[in-house]
Amino acid sequence: MRPVAVATTEGAHVDDDWPSLHDALAAEEIDGQLCVWDDDSVEWDGYELVVIRSTWDYTKDRAGFLLWASRVPNLFNRYPIIEYSTDKHYLADLEATGHRIVPTTFCDVGDRPTFPDTRFVVKPTVGAGSMDADKYGPDEHERAN
C-alpha cells in the first residue's frame, strides 16, 4: 500500500469522519495516516503524498504553517493556493472580479471601524470556520470592538 499523510491538528475529535476516509483510502490501496502538521517527529519525506485536511489550528501560527507547507515534500495542496486562501482578504479579489460576496469591510488591529445599523458579524481574516467569530446586533457596536 502507498503511504499518504493526511495533515491534521492535534486533539480529540478533530476528524470525526476519519474512519470513513481511512476505509475509502484503503479500498484504493492507500495507507492513509493522520499526521499532526506541526509535529516535528513526522518524517514527511517518507510519504508519497501529503494532503492538508484538518489543520484548523494554523490560525494561531499562520507564518509557521506557511513555512511548514513550503517545506513539505510531495504536498498535494499547492503552496500559492494555501498562502492565498488562509487569509480572508481573497474575498476582496473575488468581489473585484465580479463575484458576489457578503458585504465585507476589512479592518486592521487597532482600527475603530464603523459598524452597520443592522445585524453584523466580526471575524478574523485568518480564521477557520467560525473560530473567533461572533454576531452582533445594531445596538452592540461597543461590544464588537
PLM regions with names:
Residues M1-F76, I81, H89:
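ATP-binding N-terminal substructure of ATP-dependent carboxylate-amine bond-forming enzymes
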